């Protein structure tokens, strides 16, 4: 598989999810995204209007965080957030599924939650975030199947948010892993894409994730890693499985 620099950039998603992000932060973030040439930026719903104003003409997809970061919002709240984000110009949606319902084996509730957002998105790409770092293997498999059946176009590993509650479960929360990429790729249909997010800090790991099945990469270190790709491989590299 040949991976060009342009394709690598398009796989990278920049995120600005901090609760304290102000207008100046959004402007700086968008300027960086435009300069680097990433494929997608992801921001909180309240920051969609300014992000659209700054990036709409640059060919960069603009995604809204929905139900962030825990996914425990009522379905009606997620639907309203999605509708407002779409009205403001969002072209994609990153939604957190109802993880508690999944772990409680209330699969119908999980599916209905996703379906509501998919319908509210009106044909825009919906990414279902399943929070792999708190799930068993069986729960990850079930989450992937539910998300695909409910209409998600892409399944994402984690929000990347390391909360106090997460640290109460594990002292070493992991984001994207090679094992999860392989598991998700084996469960999902070929047309359903996978986004690896959380803990991607090196170029080598990013390339390993792509080899394992990742279509998109959510990285806080994206600018640095893109620069390293260009320094090491120039315009592209042949990835050996």
Specify the residue positions occupied by each region the protein language model found.
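Alpha/beta enzyme core
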Residues: 2-36, 40, 46-194, 201-241
């Amino acid at each position: 598989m040949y991976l060009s620099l342009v394709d690598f950039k398009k796989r990278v998603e920049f995120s600005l999810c901090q609760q304290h992000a102000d207008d100046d932060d959004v402007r700086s973030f968008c300027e960086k995204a435009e300069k680097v040439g990433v494929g997608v930026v992801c921001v909180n719903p309240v920051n969609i209007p300014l992000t659209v104003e700054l990036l709409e003409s640059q060919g960069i997809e603009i995604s809204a965080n929905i139900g962030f970061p825990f996914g425990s919002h009522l379905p009606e709240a997620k639907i309203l957030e999605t509708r407002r984000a779409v009205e403001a110009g969002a072209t994609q949606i990153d939604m957190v599924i109802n993880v508690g319902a999944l772990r409680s084996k209330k699969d119908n509730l999980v599916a209905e939650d996703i379906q509501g957002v998919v319908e509210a998105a009106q044909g825009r790409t919906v990414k279902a975030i399943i929070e792999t770092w708190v799930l068993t293997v069986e729960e990850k498999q079930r989450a992937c199947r539910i998300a695909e059946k409910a209409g998600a176009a892409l399944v994402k590993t984690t929000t990347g948010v390391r909360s106090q509650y997460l640290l109460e479960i594990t002292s070493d929360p992991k984001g994207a892993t090679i094992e999860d990429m392989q598991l998700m790729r084996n469960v999902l249909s070929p047309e359903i894409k996978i986004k690896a997010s959380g803990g991607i800090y090196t170029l080598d790991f990013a390339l390993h994730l792509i080899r394992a099945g990742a279509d998109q990469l959510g990285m806080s270190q994206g600018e640095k890693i893109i620069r390293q790709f260009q320094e090491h491989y120039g315009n592209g590299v042949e990835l050996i499985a």
